[in-house]
């Protein structure tokens, strides 16, 4: 059975999360169309796996200067997000949210770590989204995911560690 569910309502300009529960296996994705003054682009957002690995420690991502929007979905999001900039300065912030968290990664972030606090529930899923002058890209938080659909920055010696 193939079914299309239209999300025609005004979802705003930002990211959003869709949580699907089923008693059988299913395949799902979200088609997003993006248009700016100079181009048109689209992305198929695929599901991310449940982020149970957060229970065993942080999820760490090497961003190399990219500035995505991080989106997390869970009934009870209670996480500490730490990041290291290209100069080696470490910063962190704690989030206590329900259902959906959207956070813009600061400029010049080299590495990002997400750690669940003891009060937080397992994450239902998460993703990184990039929107900019050259298009849109989506990367689900899945073990082994590799971003290969967006332009990667040219690294210099200061970002290599």
Kindly give the residue locations of the regions a language model identified.
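Conserved functional hotspot residues at active sites or interaction interfaces
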Residues: 25-76, 94-99, 106, 120-161
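Intrinsically disordered, low-complexity Pro/Gly/Ser/Thr-rich segments with frequent PxxP/GP/PP motifs
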Residues: 1-17, 85-113, 117-118
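Conserved beta-strand and immediately adjacent loop positions that scaffold enzyme active sites
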Residues: 17, 69, 80
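Beta-strand-rich binding/interaction modules
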Residues: 78-85
